[in-house]
């Protein structure tokens, strides 16, 4: 921190020397003052350019001095004390919420304000050219800066003006907007009640007057007809099975169990297997 202060003091001293040299003050005595050179070839336009260079050097020196001062202040702050501009962003509270964020924040110890310096436009007016000043932005206190609102508070402000019974119409009209809709805990029941007019439930006494046959759904009758159709189709398929065969089965006459029957079965061209139980002839 001491080195930063020493650097800022040296840069301030250098700036004062440059300003005294540019404004045409009497020459300072000392080994640092260079001897004036009298040259006839030097044109006033070149002198004006040299003054411009000195002015730019002084501007750079002052900007470096301001940056070093800010760094020194950041290093000098304790760890427990955050900077004021860090509180300007969204901390969860806003103007719409219960209390302001300035009332609930802990008190920040005030530091000793540094000595005021002349404005940027008054420091450098050697060539009568107005300089741009950055003091207009830095002089605004953080308490008066516009602070952005959080998303829930903005949505609450947008839907706060709607009445309790008119939010359904607003939802239908603003359905294509990207802003969310703030509803209550029973929002689904409200939607069902308002958009779908549900019939009232009938009493138990009225249910007794209606016969049970009418209360059955038609799906039961459709199921019975489907089962009957399947049974009829199965019986028809069994009756038509013999007509679809190329060699319909037919009953054969009973033959005597002897060698003549075996010979007859061997000579015929039937595809049925030959089953012969009497093997006495073998």
UniProtKB/Swiss-Prot annotation:
Its main location: nucleus. Keywords: Cytoplasm, Nucleus. Residues 256-282 are annotated as: Inka box 2. One of its GO terms (biological process) is neural tube development. It holds the Pfam family FAM212. Belongs to the INKA family. This is PAK4-inhibitor INKA1. It comes from Mus musculus (Mouse). The gene is Inka1.
């Amino acid at each position: 921190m001491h080195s930063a202060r020493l650097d800022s003091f040296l840069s301030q001293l250098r700036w004062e020397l440059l300003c005294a040299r540019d404004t045409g003050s009497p020459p300072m005595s000392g080994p640092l003052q260079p001897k004036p050179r009298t040259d006839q070839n030097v044109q006033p336009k070149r002198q004006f350019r040299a003054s411009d260079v000195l002015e730019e050097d002084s501007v750079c020196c002052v900007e470096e001095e301001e940056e070093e001062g800010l760094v020194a202040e950041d290093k000098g702050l304790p760890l427990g004390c955050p900077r004021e501009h860090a509180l300007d962003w969204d901390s969860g509270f806003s103007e719409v919420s219960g209390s302001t964020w300035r009332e609930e924040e802990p008190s920040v110890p005030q530091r000793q304000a540094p000595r005021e310096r002349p404005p940027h436009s008054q420091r450098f007016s050697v060539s009568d050219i107005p300089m741009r000043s950055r003091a207009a932005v830095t002089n605004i206190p953080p308490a008066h800066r516009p602070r952005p609102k959080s998303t829930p508070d903005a949505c609450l402000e947008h839907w706060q003006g709607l009445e309790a019974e008119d939010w359904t119409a607003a939802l239908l009209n603003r359905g294509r907007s990207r802003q969310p809709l703030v509803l209550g805990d029973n929002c689904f029941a409200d939607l069902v009640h308002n958009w779908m007019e549900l019939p009232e439930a009938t009493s138990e006494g009225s249910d007794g007057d209606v016969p049970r046959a009418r209360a059955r759904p038609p799906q039961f009758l459709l199921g019975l007809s489907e089962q009957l159709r399947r049974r009829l189709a199965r019986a028809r398929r069994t009756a038509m099975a013999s007509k679809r065969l190329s060699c319909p089965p037919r009953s054969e006459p009973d033959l005597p169990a002897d060698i003549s029957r075996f010979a007859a079965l061997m000579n015929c061209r039937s595809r049925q297997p030959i089953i012969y139980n009497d093997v006495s002839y073998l």
